[in-house]
């Protein structure tokens, strides 16, 4: 099993799909990494040589991934909340922040429905 950026990549997957197991890498980025490293993205992870894995690791050094990316995202949201802007306020209240309606829908952000009895109190 290949280990890249501290993540075990499933060996049976193609290189393009396997790289998406790393937080911060999607299909497009994975494909660009494979092209830059000179690896066919249809090649399975278990078929990659140590040299191929090193080429992939070299490509990943320029990207913000995993814990650093999660930390950066969290800090950006915290900054919005600290400055008291509209988006920060909506984050704090757990509501959608991009103008969607909330009278109905928005259940993903708001969570499960509260019963009518809970609203009357």
UniProtKB/Swiss-Prot annotation:
Protein name according to UniProt: Small ribosomal subunit protein uS13
UniProt keyword annotation of Ribosomal protein present: yes
Region annotation Disordered: where it falls in the sequence: 94-121
GO cellular component: cytosol; small ribosomal subunit
Cell membrane recorded as keyword: no
Family to which the UniProt record says this protein belongs: Belongs to the universal ribosomal protein uS13 family.
Molecular function, one GO term: tRNA binding
InterPro entries recorded: Rbsml_uS13_C, Ribosomal_uS13, Ribosomal_uS13-like_H2TH, Ribosomal_uS13_bac-type, Ribosomal_uS13_CS
GO terms, biological process: translation
Top-level division of the source organism's lineage: Bacteria
Keywords: Ribonucleoprotein, Ribosomal protein, RNA-binding, rRNA-binding, tRNA-binding
Subunit structure, as described in the record: Part of the 30S ribosomal subunit. Forms a loose heterodimer with protein S19. Forms two bridges to the 50S subunit in the 70S ribosome.
Function statement: Located at the top of the head of the 30S subunit, it contacts several helices of the 16S rRNA. In the 70S ribosome it contacts the 23S rRNA (bridge B1a) and protein L5 of the 50S subunit (bridge B1b), connecting the 2 subunits; these bridges are implicated in subunit movement. Contacts the tRNAs in the A and P-sites.
């Amino acid at each position: 099993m290949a280990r890249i950026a501290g993540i075990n990549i499933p060996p049976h997957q193609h290189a393009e799909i396997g790289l998406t197991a790393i937080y911060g890498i999607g299909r497009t980025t994975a494909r660009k990494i494979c092209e830059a490293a000179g690896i066919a993205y249809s090649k399975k992870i278990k078929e990659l040589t140590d040299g191929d894995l090193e080429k992939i690791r070299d490509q990943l050094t320029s990207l913000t991934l995993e814990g650093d990316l999660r930390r950066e995202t969290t800090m950006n949201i915290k900054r919005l909340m600290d400055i008291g802007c509209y988006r920060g306020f909506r984050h704090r209240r757990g509501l959608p922040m991009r103008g969607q309606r909330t009278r109905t829908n928005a259940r993903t952000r708001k969570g499960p429905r509260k019963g009518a009895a809970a609203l009357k109190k």
